Structure formats: structure tokens, C-alpha cells
Curated annotation (Swiss-Prot):
Protein name: DNA replication and repair protein RecF
GO cellular component: cytoplasm
Location in or out of the cell: Cytoplasm
Protein family membership: Belongs to the RecF family.
Transmembrane annotation, as ranges: none
Binding positions (ATP): G30, D31, N32, G33, S34, G35, K36, T37
Keyword tags: ATP-binding, Cytoplasm, DNA damage, DNA repair, DNA replication, DNA-binding, Nucleotide-binding, SOS response
Gene Ontology molecular functions: ATP binding; single-stranded DNA binding
HAMAP family: RecF
InterPro entries tied to this protein: DNA-binding_RecF (IPR001238), DNA-binding_RecF_CS (IPR018078), P-loop_NTPase (IPR027417), RecF/RecN/SMC_N (IPR003395), RecF_2 (IPR042174)
């Protein structure tokens, strides 16, 4: 998908914005705090239904207004997202109302690189599950319905566990259902990582020339037994603490460099390079399966990678023939790293000029 036009209304510090980006490389310049990252944030919203920055949706609404609208048009789709101060959300696809954000998100495959992306490798498992599940969601159609069913079952069982009102026979039903969907989710993740690792190893050779890298799945339970048996063996613990302690919701991935977890093997600078390779690997895998590129959002590239890896990333992005949005203080920092001249935009006081 390529965004042909992007319109923002009362989003962050923008009143009204209409943008016609290049289908290739776009560089957005401006001082810190000018709003250039907010432009990336609006595109991200179309692919995820939320911001990648801290805070709730009300912070996205320009002060003094009742809501914001983000609208984009591509060759095949017209997509609009509106959120109001009362929490109401409105989604539009080709002029019709849609109920589920997943129906919109599936059409807008967005890959994001920010200074905080390295936290995927350093922080808790939640961000790593989001990383892998983005990929599975976009290439395995049944994954979303499996995940919705699993999370609903998990919520119901946890509620009963907290209330201390879960008879043995009824609990068996919840565990059987959780095991069924949880193992389907885990198999989808395993298949995805098996395919993704080929791309990771290729890109690691380019970005980390002396490092061999791969990603391994930790399913969320001891896989020497079935998930049902694992749930059975943790029943007393679950009743004691009031939540389900094993399952697909406890999964994690281990990113390994030369046989050691990356956070114990690589320097801070190398970790930034490693997450860049992982994100590009996801994008390349998506492009191979879906036969169309992702949209890449890169915030503050020059502060994250050294000059050599900046040039390498820019070359990789250009070779993908993808639509790319990159923020920088000045265009001179990046424009010479692309073979073809990128389209330049400048943000100042909530106004974008080409």
C-alpha cells in the first residue's frame, strides 16, 4: 500500500493538514517539538489504532477541539479514523462504516523505527510478543480470530479464578478451550519465526558483519507436555493467585547473537542496529508473502545509527521499493544517502510545507 494523500484534522498540534507524499522516500524536517513525529504518529494510528507514544487518545486531540480525524487515500482504499473526547471511535473504509480496527489495520502494514525501538530487546516480554504477533497477524489470516477467542476465554477463566468460584468440571472446559486456541497460536508463531529467521540471518550479516543472529520462541509453557497438561499441573497455583499462569499469553521470544541473548552480547549501539535488522526482516518477509511492501516510519534516524549503518538502512529501504517517511532536523543529514532525490517536507508551527 502507498499513501497517495494524507489528511489530518485537529491532530496533536495540527489544525488542518493535507499532504501528498511520494510513493518512495519522504523526509520530514523541523525543529524538535515542531510536530514532525506527530506526522509519523498519524500514519501509525491507521495501522495500529493507537499511538506509539505514551498517553491516551485524548492527548492526540488538538486543544480546544472535540476530536481528531486521520484520513488517507491509496489506489485501492480510502480509510478514515476519528476519535472524540467522549471516547467514541469512528472507522470508515471506502465510505462505509466498519466496526473492527483489525479490518483497517490489515490494510495498512506499518513498520516503525524510533529511538525507543531498542526496548523490544531490553524490556519485558510484552513488547516482544507484540513484535512477533504483528507479523503473524499480517500473514496468517486465522491468527486474529484465534487470538480473540483465546483472550476472551482467558479473561473469563481469570475472572472466575479471582472470584474463587470455579468448579473442577467447569474449569476443565476452560482449560480445554484455552489449550485448543493457545496451541494454534503457538504453532502460528513457530511457523512465522521459522520463516523470519532466514531474513534475520541475511540482514544480520549486512548490519552486524561478525554476528550470527536468530530468534527463538518460548511458548509460555513447558512444551515437553501439552498446554492442557500444563494448565492442569498449574491449577492449584492459578487458584491461589487468581490468574492463569501458563499459556500463549505468557510467550516470549529470545533474540540470540552468537548463541547468547543479544542484551548480554551486544553493545548499546549494536542493539540499535540489531532491532533495525529485525524490523527490516519483518518487512521483507511481509513483502515476499503479500507481494506488496510495508510503509516504513523512521523517527530521528541520525541519532540512532552511525553514518555507515544510516547509509546501509537507507539503501535497504530504497531497494525495497517501499514508501518511507523519515524525520530529521535538516534534510542535509539524509538526502545524500539515497540514489534518487527524496521528497522533502518541512514542519513549523503546525504547518507542513513541501
Amino acid at each position: 500500500m502507498f499513501i497517495e494523500t494524507l489528511n489530518l484534522s485537529h491532530f496533536r498540534n495540527f489544525s488542518e493538514v493535507a499532504l501528498s507524499p511520494s510513493p518512495k522516500i519522504n523526509i520530514i524536517t523541523g525543529d524538535n517539538g515542531s510536530g514532525k513525529t506527530s506526522l509519523l504518529e498519524a500514519i501509525y494510528l491507521l495501522g495500529f489504532g493507537r499511538s506509539f507514544r505514551p498517553g491516551g487518545f485524548r492527548q492526540l486531540i488538538k486543544e480546544g477541539n472535540s476530536g481528531f480525524t486521520v484520513f488517507c487515500r491509496s489506489q485501492d482504499y480510502a480509510i478514515g479514523v476519528r476519535r472524540s473526547t467522549d471516547g467514541e471511535q469512528s472507522l470508515r473504509l471506502n465510505g462505509a462504516n466498519v466496526q473492527r480496527m483489525s479490518d483497517v489495520a490489515r490494510l495498512v502494514p506499518v513498520q516503525l523505527l524510533t529511538p525507543e525501538s531498542v526496548d523490544i530487546l531490553l524490556e519485558g516480554p510484552g513488547q516482544r510478543r507484540q513484535f512477533i504477533d504483528w507479523g503473524v497477524f499480517h500473514v496468517e489470516h486465522s491468527f486474529y480470530s484465534d487470538w480473540v477467542a483465546y483472550t476472551q476465554l482467558l479473561k473469563q477463566r481469570n475472572s472466575l479464578l479471582k472470584q474463587r468460584s470455579l468448579p473442577v468440571r467447569e474449569d476443565r472446559y476452560w482449560k480445554e478451550q484455552l489449550a485448543y486456541y493457545g496451541e494454534r497460536i503457538s504453532k502460528s508463531r513457530e511457523k512465522y519465526l521459522e520463516e523470519l529467521n532466514d531474513y534475520i540471518q541475511e540482514l544480520a550479516k549486512s548490519f552486524l558483519s561478525d554476528v550470527t543472529m536468530e530468534v527463538r520462541l518460548k511458548s509460555g509453557w513447558d512444551t515437553s507436555q501439552s498446554l492442557f497438561d500444563a494448565l492442569e499441573s498449574h491449577t492449584e497455583k492459578d487458584k491461589k493467585y487468581g490468574f492463569t499462569s501458563v499459556g500463549a499469553h505468557k510467550a516470549d521470544i529470545k533474540v540470540i547473537a552468537d548463541g547468547v541473548e543479544v542484551k548480554h552480547r551486544l553493545s548499546r549501539g549494536q542493539l540499535k542496529t540489531a532491532i533495525t535488522a529485525l524490523k527490516l526482516a519483518q518487512g521483507k518477509h511481509y513483502q515476499k508473502i503479500k507481494r506488496q511492501p510495508c510503509i516504513y516510519l523512521v523517527d530521528d534516524l541520525t541519532s540512532e545509527l552511525d553514518s555507515k549503518n544510516q547509509a546501509l538502512l537507507c539503501r535497504e529501504l530504497e531497494n525495497l521499493d517501499a514508501q518511507v517517511f523519515i524525520t530529521a532536523i535538516t534534510g542535509k543529514q539524509l538526502s545524500d544517502k539515497f540514489q534518487k532525490s527524496p521528497r522533502m517536507f518541512h514542519v513549523e508551527h503546525g504547518v507542513i510545507n513541501e
